[in-house]
Amino acid sequence: MKKLISVLCLLALTLSMLSGCGAPAAPETTAAPETTAAAEAPTEAPTAAPVSVRLGAMTGPTGIGMVKLFEDADQDAASGYSYTIKGAADELTPMLLQEELDIVSVPANLASVLYNKTEGGVRALAVNVLGVLYIAEFGSDDVSSVADLKGKTIYATGKGSTPEYFLRYVLTRNGLDPDKDVTIDFKSEPSEVVAVLNAEGSGIAMLPQPYVIAAAGQLGENFKIKLSVSEEWEKVGAGSLCTTACILVRTKFAEEHPEAVEKFLSDFAFAAAWVNENVEEAGELCGKFEIVKAPVAKKAIPKCNIVCITGSEMRSALGGCLQVLFEQNPKAVGGNLPGDDFYYGA
């Protein structure tokens, strides 16, 4: 208990930056007379009860890929899933650490933080959201490449967290000094960024989905997406991917219920593909579960990069991304990069 409390306290600090049942005993038998040995019918071993997997997700892009599983859980009690949805990571992760949840979707860097804090108590099952950051321009048409950002001011959110580190990485890999060649003006909320653009009549912003869609709704057709940070990362990332979120499983649960984990991976792969192929219906489910408002979700889903990347491909994508974060700020990933055991199935 002391260890758990310690872990939870450390986790809270970090977030400020950003039955093994045996078979029943065989009944005693009396030896049959040697003259009439009747053959006994074989007895079947008892079947283990199905495991109900407790899922957890946050509102926003990290939860979008799971909405089909949530709906299935509501419609069919035998689906094998129950779920919890929270508004922030610091509401969700304590439930995982206290073994109230089994599998959760969390920001990628937080996954590494939790691995370090729990000393390997969690493992990454899949990357489920790639980059959701976009650079947009309002009132002008000057930007068509990263190089065009030189000398410009970029309004953004996420100072001291992954959005800043992702932007700095892309700028640096394209030959720009983030501290000299551009001005990054950080605001506390996306709404502040929109307000500044509206007041000035023009400007450049880096925002995550679905806030980009929401901003376009307020600023109109003169607000246009010019660059995808995820796509620009892929051009220079040497095999790594701009990773927003991944799916974690408690190590103990994975060891005790490997079949349930494999079933989940299969079900989630289907669910993620379903979301991308059924945007209208998926958008309605996002609204139902209060992940993202339905009208916004329907426009944002195609740009949220919902995926299911597992195994060695996951390790390359996620591991490379965590390396980028580690090089800029080790605390962003919990002080150390995860060990090989972090990557399930790799």
Segments the model singles out, each with a brief description of its role:
Residues M1-L10:
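Positively charged n-region of N-terminal signal peptides that target proteins for export
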Residues C9-M17, L325:
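Hydrophobic core
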Residues L18-T30:
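Bacterial lipoprotein signal-peptidase II cleavage site
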Residues A32, A38-A41, A45-D179, I184-F186, ...:
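Short, glycine-/small- and polar/acidic-enriched structural segments
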Residues D74-Y81, E232-S240, V307-R315:
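Short, solvent-exposed loop/beta-turn-alpha elements that line the ligand-binding surface or hinge
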Residues N109-L110, T118, S191-L285:
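Pocket-lining segment of extracytoplasmic ligand-binding domains
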Residues A254-Q328:
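Secondary-structure end/capping motifs
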Residues G319, Q323-A346:
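Conserved C-terminal helix/tail region of periplasmic/extracytoplasmic solute-binding proteins
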